[in-house]
């Protein structure tokens, strides 16, 4: 009797073992796993914000999503997941640094990297200030309701502390410049702080943003040369302001319905169906100002070719944008990084086509000689 019972138990154990080895669908377990069939322990819901089987992405949003969870609200508050704003702040700095370079020479790479760091920090600080001012409005706008302060992921006190940290680091970058540039950079803080309030009192907040975002067109030149040359810097600054009026009006069309409901103002609400005509005027003014800046800087053919390409790109944006479709407005807005990079490339190539000054030739000869002797 015991022998028959033991035999039955042994057969049962063998059956269980065979079923386990063959996996949940009658296949060998090794084959099941290699084919990606989920086992019992694998059938958990994926973590929020992830999708099983998605290819590794190196986009800014993916990098932010992969950061430690406690840091993610702060990175989003800086808009590191949407770097287009940092590019639009940084590119006018590169134009100015490029125009200030010695004839026949590349721009100062140290200054470019320094201003790049400053652009990340000051864009983050500006977004923090903006979201602190607008936290009650952001809750009422579909596109901005999930911003960290509006959503309650970061408290007002935490945002103040974070803002202080960003401004402290930005001050460290600013102190690497000459005294003239330090004073000029400090003056821009007033624009950064007051810009978010402008949309409450005037239909021209995009103009205030242009004055703020293109400050680097003045600061870059002074950082290289020690002071501003009005003949070059002012037309360049004006062209940047016109550029901002174009791209930020397109951007503002995304939120025009919500803005109208909650009482915020913008050029999108002011221009409405006349947007193309207004933006065309801004585009012509931008191209004219860039041409004047180039003439006063002694620029060459590649620069003017780049200015023509910028004009063509802007014309395409203005006459193809669907101001009633938010997705198209966003696409046209983000394409302005290409505009800024085209102009920077034209500045660099145009400067390289200039004949080097005697001072630059002497400096290069000294550098080459020191490299050969070392």
UniProtKB/Swiss-Prot annotation:
The chain crosses the membrane at residues 84-104, 109-129, 149-169, 173-193, 201-221, 231-251, 278-298, 333-353. GO terms for molecular function: 4-hydroxybenzoate polyprenyltransferase activity; prenyltransferase activity. It is a multi-pass membrane protein. Its main location: mitochondrion. Pfam families: UbiA. GO terms for biological process: glycerol metabolic process; isoprenoid biosynthetic process; ubiquinone biosynthetic process. The keyword Hydrolase does not apply. Keywords: Isoprene biosynthesis, Membrane, Mitochondrion, Mitochondrion inner membrane, Transferase, Transit peptide, Transmembrane, Transmembrane helix, Ubiquinone biosynthesis. It is found in: Mitochondrion inner membrane. Its EC number is 2.5.1.39. Pathway: Cofactor biosynthesis; ubiquinone biosynthesis. Residues 1-34 form a transit peptide. Its cofactor is Mg(2+). Residues 105-108, 170-172, 222-230, 299-332 are mitochondrial intermembrane. The keyword Transit peptide applies. GO terms for cellular component: extrinsic component of mitochondrial inner membrane; mitochondrial inner membrane; mitochondrion. Residues 35-83, 130-148, 194-200, 252-277, 354-374 are mitochondrial matrix. Belongs to the UbiA prenyltransferase family. Mediates the second step in the final reaction sequence of coenzyme Q (CoQ) biosynthesis. Catalyzes the prenylation of para-hydroxybenzoate (PHB) with an all-trans polyprenyl donor (such as all-trans-nonaprenyl diphosphate). The length of the polyprenyl side chain varies depending on the species, in humans, the side chain is comprised of 10 isoprenyls producing CoQ10 (also known as ubiquinone), whereas rodents predominantly generate CoQ9. However, this specificity is not complete, human tissues have low amounts of CoQ9 and rodent organs contain some CoQ10. This is 4-hydroxybenzoate polyprenyltransferase, mitochondrial. It comes from Mus musculus. The lineage of its organism: Eukaryota, Metazoa, Chordata, Craniata, Vertebrata.
């Amino acid at each position: 009797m015991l022998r028959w019972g033991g035999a039955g138990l042994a057969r049962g154990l063998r059956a269980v073992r065979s079923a386990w080895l063959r996996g949940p669908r009658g296949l060998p377990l090794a084959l099941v796993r290699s084919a990606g069939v989920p086992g019992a322990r694998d059938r958990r819901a994926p973590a929020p914000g992830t999708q099983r089987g998605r290819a590794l992405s190196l986009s800014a949003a993916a990098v932010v999503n992969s950061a430690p969870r406690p840091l993610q609200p702060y990175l989003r508050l800086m808009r590191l997941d949407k770097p287009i704003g940092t590019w639009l702040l940084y590119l006018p700095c590169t134009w100015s640094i490029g125009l200030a370079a010695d004839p026949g020479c590349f721009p100062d790479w140290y200054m470019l990297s320094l201003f790049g760091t400053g652009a990340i920090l000051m864009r983050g600080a500006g977004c923090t200030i903006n979201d602190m001012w607008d936290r009650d409005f952001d809750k009422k706008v579909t596109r901005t309701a999930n911003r960290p302060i509006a959503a309650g992921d970061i408290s007002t006190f935490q945002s103040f502390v974070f803002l202080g940290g960003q401004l402290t680091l930005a001050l460290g970058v600013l102190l690497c410049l000459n005294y003239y540039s330090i004073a000029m950079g400090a003056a821009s803080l007033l624009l950064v702080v007051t810009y978010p309030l402008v949309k409450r009192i005037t239909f021209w907040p995009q103009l205030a943003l242009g004055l703020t975002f293109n400050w680097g067109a003045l600061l870059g030149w002074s950082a290289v040369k020690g002071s501003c040359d009005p003949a070059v810097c002012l037309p360049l600054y004006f062209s940047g302001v016109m550029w901002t009026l174009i791209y930020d009006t397109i951007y503002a069309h995304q939120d025009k319905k919500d803005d109208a409901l909650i009482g915020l103002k913008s050029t999108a609400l002011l221009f409405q169906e006349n947007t193309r005509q207004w933006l065309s005027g801004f585009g012509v003014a931008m191209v004219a100002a860039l041409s004047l800046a180039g003439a006063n800087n002694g620029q060459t053919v590649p620069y003017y070719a780049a200015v023509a390409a910028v004009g063509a790109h802007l014309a395409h944006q203005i006459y193809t944008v669907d101001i009633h479709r938010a997705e198209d407005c966003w696409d046209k807005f983000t394409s302005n990084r290409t505009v800024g990079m085209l102009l920077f490339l034209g500045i660099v190539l145009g400067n390289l086509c200039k004949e080097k000054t005697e001072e630059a030739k002497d400096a290069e000869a000294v550098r080459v000689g020191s490299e050969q002797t070392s």
